[in-house]
Design a protein with these regions (language model features):
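OB-fold/S1-family RNA-binding modules
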Residues: 1-31, 77, 81-193
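Structural detector for short beta-strands of small beta-barrel domains
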Residues: 3, 7, 37-49
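Short aromatic-glycine-enriched beta-strand elements
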Residues: 15, 51-57
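Short coil-to-beta-strand transition motifs
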Residues: 34-41, 73-76
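Short, conserved beta-turn/loop elements at beta-strand boundaries and strand-helix junctions
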Residues: 48-53, 85-88
Length: 193
């Protein structure tokens, strides 16, 4: 067999994704019980770390560490996103710069502006995609990045994807107060494959 093939399945109730290249296993990804990168939490500020400008926070999945956490006071609720898997015995690595990623679009609430992947070089294609971005985002204060796979995607699918992510971002941003809670689960192997 020549070419690339993505194989999706389940093993012991967990998602599994495999990449086959020219008939050989190239990559394999098993889902775990650990929180997935991209998970968005409403966390509660716990205690600052002097000298580092960071803060420990409480999440439903355990303690997290937030870098550059200036202006936060203990007990304050904040929205954070998991950036990567935590090392054993360490706090979850978190950021306040939340991104809402999907197949075609990335919505950036804290970074306004409409952008298209640099890998799309065809000017006509870029203009078409920019038109879709303008029509779907309107006067929104949120930013948008259209990913490289938009080059071959259907316009309606791109528009639907942008709307879904913008709606999710708007909904999540209104849920800033309250107890620690998982608001959005990160993508698993099937979605990322």
């Amino acid at each position: 067999m020549k070419g690339r093939l993505i194989v999706l399945d389940h093993h012991k109730g967990q998602q599994v994704a495999a990449l086959m290249v020219d008939g050989r296993l190239d990559d394999l990804w098993f889902d775990t019980d650990a929180p997935r990168p991209g998970t968005i939490y409403r966390a509660i500020a716990d205690r600052p770390v002097k000298g580092m400008g960071g803060m420990f926070v409480k999440t439903p999945d355990g303690p997290g560490f937030l870098r550059h956490a200036k202006g936060l006071s203990p007990g304050q609720s904040i929205l954070v996103q998991l950036t990567s898997y935590a090392e054993p015995g360490k706090a979850l690595p978190l950021t306040q710069k939340i991104l809402f990623k999907s197949r075609f679009a990335i919505v950036t609430p804290d970074a306004p502006g409409l952008n298209i992947s640099r890998s799309i070089r065809d000017e006509e294609q870029r203009e078409l995609l920019m038109g879709i971005a303008h029509s779907e985002m309107g006067e929104s204060n949120m930013g948008l990045i259209l990913r490289s796979c938009c080059a071959t995607a259907d316009r309606a699918d791109i528009a639907d994807d942008i709307n879904a992510m913008a709606d999710l971002a708007t909904q999540i941003l209104t849920e800033q107060t309250g107890a620690a809670e998982t608001l959005v689960e990160g993508d698993g192997p099937h979605a990322l494959a």
